[in-house]
Amino acid sequence: MSEILSRVWTVSHRVEIWLLILVAYLLQRNVNSGHLPTKAADPEAFMNVSEIIKHKGYPSEEYEVATEDGYILSVNRIPRGQTRLKKEGSRPVVLLQHGLLGDASNWISNLPNNSLGFILADAGFDVWMGNSRGNTWSRKHKTLSIDQDEFWAFSYDEMARFDLPAVINFILQKTGQKKVYYVGYSQGTTMGFIAFSTMPELAHKIKMYFALAPIATVKYARSPGTKFLLLPDMMIKVLFGRQEFLYQTRFFRQLFIYLCGQMILDQICSNIILLLGGFNTNNMNMSRANVYVAHTPAGTSVQNILHWSQAVNSGELRAFDWGSETKNQEKCNQPTPIRYKVRDMMVPTAMWTGGQDWLSNPDDVKTLLSEVTNLIYHKNIPEWAHVDFIWGLDAPQRVYNEIIHLMKQEPNLPQGTCRVKL
């Protein structure tokens, strides 16, 4: 066994070395050629979330929110839009939650008329954007250091159980409102399905749940990334350790910004961005590519990746399996992982799905649709893949305007299960 692990370790290092050699070759080739067209790096590639918001001419606020288990999360806010710069009293509150390896910048990476965060602010909403524990902006804890394994002992279980309640309660306390609209994307929807089905008191604080590229199960996911997740847990730990996964170091951030600034590498850059979720290249603004790669991947824990590995293998929405009945009993009060029941969620829910989405696969979506008790609206966009929901050029026309319409229609919707037409 030790010999096998040693070989895997050697292979992984060889892959890294060859990758660096390839990157160095591309860099040297581009620099020496001189005549290759180069795009100037967008200044937003070097900004944090608050700086991007201000750069676009919007008011920006940033807060730190402490969770019950000690993590300190960064939360960004756009309190009003460009057309409403004066304070005019309270506005309906919206919380946007990014997906796996994402951050709050995912909602503001495009131009203001193409980014959901800015569109909602201009439509009269008070916009808040979360950052899950372990990503670029949420790497603090009251007692733990990021150098400790204990800091990274979390998955989307804890994000649903601790992060969402902490952020939602903070927002309600800060704004004086009683309920929020929740918009989740990818893993952000997984957090919502778990939190709102297991914590009724939290679910009562949600006016309406908008699920973009929803993921409850990944039984039929066909992304190349899910093939990697079929590896045994031990193999994943050997390859990536026990702490953080795909945290973007300053070196690689600068490297990706440079590479995606080379016009000749546009196709390669777009392929890398789209590789995990499916291809719909013509629907992306590639002039923003260096902004995308400067902030994503934003990192998570290896344990979170292990949890997704377990989800791929089980085909179910379950709590993290800690590897022994004793540890599961300690963490979950039962010897086997809890199986979450989406049917227990009563929040009015609207969903948008993509026919070419490799992660939120249509077959998994079909199962999910049958389990959402209070589904008020569903729209499938046949040619859309995974990232279209946050970066697609036609996202405002095909999804965002419908979200705003439902939000403004919400006070007049009948209580209980209903269907709406747009």
Curated annotation (Swiss-Prot):
The gene is Lipm. InterPro entries: AB_hydrolase_1, AB_hydrolase_fold, Lipase_euk. It comes from Mus musculus (Mouse). Belongs to the AB hydrolase superfamily. Lipase family. This is Lipase member M. It is found in: Secreted. Glycans are attached at N48. Keywords: Disulfide bond, Glycoprotein, Hydrolase, Lipid degradation, Lipid metabolism, Secreted, Signal. Residues 1-33 form the signal peptide. It comes from the Eukaryota. Pfam families: Abhydrolase_1. Its EC number is 3.1.1.-. GO terms for molecular function: hydrolase activity, acting on ester bonds. GO terms for biological process: lipid catabolic process. The active site is at S186 (nucleophile), D357 (charge relay system), H386 (charge relay system). GO terms for cellular component: extracellular region.
